[in-house]
Design a protein with these regions (language model features):
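Active-site lumenal/periplasmic loops and adjacent helix-entry segments of GT-C-fold
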Residues: 44-196
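Start-transfer (signal-anchor) and selected internal transmembrane alpha helices
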Residues: 1-16, 21-43, 130-141
Length: 197
């Protein structure tokens, strides 16, 4: 964390913004822009419950709630409906927030999930920027706006669903069961798979 925050040098901009009088505690302006853009993007995804959550969040919220409220490993015993069923989840993504949730409450658990997700996104965008030899801000913009050209498939192979206008539907349906969703779509729908992957 200290390496990302205090020692980051942007290849694009050398201007700094002093946030404290403490010697050595300066953020480059490009780092502040990157942090704010990434946090806003994550905020809009619905993670943490601070913005609209699409219906897929119903299942994700239940995973966190059950990890918070039940002993680990979580299992569901319903003798009348068959054998014991275990909760299946991405351990590295859910357990840090769930551990905090065990000792706090739902609001703090959601904040922990938001913070853990933000850290994951910051690491991903920083690694992408390093690989592409560009700024973290540009790498974040690339992830936000890069997509699988589904708009072309929708135009060339029109179906009743989805439509291009109003732009509130998914465009992946043109290819049947195949999907190449944008990273933003994945972040907003299946974040527990998108961020760790």
């Amino acid at each position: 964390y200290k390496l990302l925050v205090t020692n980051y040098q942007s290849p694009i901009s050398t201007s700094t913004l002093a946030l404290s009088e403490v010697e050595g505690f300066h953020f480059p302006l490009s780092t502040i822009s990157w942090l704010l853009l990434t946090a806003l993007w994550l905020l809009l995804s619905g993670i943490g419950g601070y913005a609209f959550q699409n219906w897929d969040h119903n299942w994700r919220n239940v995973v966190l709630r059950d990890l918070m409220n039940f002993n680990w490993p979580v299992y569901y015993a319903q003798p009348e409906s068959g054998p014991v069923k275990m909760l299946v989840y991405y351990v590295g993504f859910w357990l840090p927030s769930a551990l905090i949730a065990k000792f706090t409450n739902w609001q703090i658990a959601n904040f922990a999930l938001f913070a853990w997700s933000l850290l994951g996104l910051l690491l991903v965008t920083h690694q992408l920027a390093s690989a592409l030899k560009t700024s973290n801000f540009k790498a974040t913009l690339l992830l936000i706006f890069f997509s699988g050209l589904d708009i072309l498939g929708t135009l060339f192979f029109p179906q009743e669903y989805p439509t291009l206008f109003p732009p509130i539907t998914h465009l992946e349906a043109w290819a049947g069961n195949l999907q190449y969703s944008s990273f933003t779509t994945q972040l907003f729908w299946v974040f527990n798979q998108a961020i760790p992957a």
